[in-house]
Amino acid sequence: MEAGRTAVLRVKRKRNAEPAEALVLACKRPRSSEVESAARETPEGQEAAAAERNVFQLVATVRSQEEPIQQLVRAALRPSRSSQLRIRRDLRASVREVRKEGRYRVVSSHRSSGTSNSLEPQCGSEAVGDAGFQLLDLVHEEENPEAAATDCRKTSDPDVILCNSVELIRERLTVSEDGSQVNHQEDPKHNDDYVYDIYYMEMAPPGWIENIMSVQPYSQEWELVNDDEQSEDIYEDEDDENSENNWRNEYPDEESSDRDEDSRGSDEYNSLSEEERSCERLMWSKYPLDVQKEFDYDSPHGLDSD
């Protein structure tokens, strides 16, 4: 597949089940020598170089697999790509662990011959091989806890494709040399309880259809929540400065502060030696005489009268 070719997913699901807004396909990324050397530096670089996430948006839902989809895909390519960019930004801020909301089993893949880039139907029929995009059929199956636990033990096999820790079963499609379909393996039982959701990606990377690692439904619940900010808000609510019980509003009593000062002075006096105490008493006894000389008083009675 050439770079920039449109890719389409056709997902078979039960009619009463809710379709996903978008699907995220993790594909193995081809590595060059420069990418490999950069990936060895950090674990994040190794993970980024090993897998590439591709977002497929929901276009429409059809009632049967025989309904043409070229018109739906062509109409979806006309609007701006702002919604797809928004999903990509949200995806970068998503958590790594995803809820088990079901699994997707690969049924078949239709590869285009690469002779035309147009989405116009050929001869009035749905020419999948010459429609200018690649089509991959998936089946959405309800999660079976017992089967999921059994398949989780198969993760050691590097050739196993996992979706939410569940093995994907790829049913290959035989294609002739001219690009026409030869054998399309399909369930012979037709069930009216199923519908088909059409997803598309305008700029799919080369080789994505052969290197699928996992298929996950996109959800807004993947957005990160900063728990630290929430805890800080709780602490701010509890620490009200205007509250009477706040420790900042506790002031000591004036009487107790005076008693504390007196006790501190008494402790300091008791800590002095006998010689230091006699010197201090002598200084206090000479204090009135010094004041009398300074202010030219003739007798201590004049000092008391002031």
UniProtKB/Swiss-Prot annotation:
It comes from the Eukaryota. One of its GO terms (biological process) is hematopoietic progenitor cell differentiation. Pfam families: Iwr1. Residues 231-243 have a biased composition (Acidic residues). InterPro entries: SLC7A6OS, TF_Iwr1_dom. Residues 30-49, 231-278 are annotated as: Disordered. This is Probable RNA polymerase II nuclear localization protein SLC7A6OS. The lineage of its organism: Eukaryota, Metazoa, Chordata, Craniata, Vertebrata.
